[in-house]
Amino acid sequence: MTNFSDLTNNNNNLNVPSTTLLNTIHVERGIIPANLCDFIVQDTEKREWKPHTWYNSVQDTYGSEETKELDVQPSTPELQQLLTPIIIQAGAAYNSKYTWLKSERTQQIMNKFTGVRFNRYQPGQIMRQHIDHIHSIFDGKEKGIPVLSFILNFNDDYEGADLFFWDNTTFKLGKGDIIMWPSNFLYPHGVTEAISGKRYSGVTWAW
C-alpha cells in the first residue's frame, strides 16, 4: 500500500537519549502544494460533513459529544491518490530523522497508513484532548498498532483551532504543512476552539 523506506544516513538523527518528547514532534512545512490544498477545501465542501465520533473500544460503540464537536468526512479515492505520495514523502522524512539506523534488522518505523479523514473546524468547535490509541484501524485483516500520527493542514485563513499538546504547547500550522508525532500515550493533544473562519485539515495514522 505504502512505502516509507526512503531512508538516508542523517547526521542530525534524533534517536538519542537526550531527545525530548517535544523534539519528536516534526513539521514538514509547505509540503502540500497550495493549489492542491485549495482544491481539497473546495471539493470537500461539495459533500456531506458529519459530526466527529469517538470510538469506545470496550463497548465497541461510536458516539459524539453533545456540543462543540468538529465535522468530519472520509477521503474519496481520487483525493487519497493525490495525497498518498505527499504523505509518503513526509513519513520518509520522519523516518530518516528518528529511526535508529544502526539497527541490523529494523530500520523502518512504519509500512502503511490509513485512508485520510478530513476535519473541519467552524467557530465554536474543538477537538477534545485525547491520545491516539486508534483501536478501530484494525479489523483482524490488518494487524499492528498505530505508530505515527499525521495532521495535514489545508488552509490558514482562520483564527483559533490550533493544535496543542499537554497543557499549553501549541503549534500554529501553515497552509500545506504536515505535522507528525508518535501515536502513543505520551502525546495528549487536542485542538483549541475555532474563533473565526473555518479550518480544514486531514488526519491519517501509520503503522
Question: Regions from the language model: what does each represent?
Answer:
Residues M1-I178, L186-W207:
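Fe(II)/2-oxoglutarate oxygenase catalytic core
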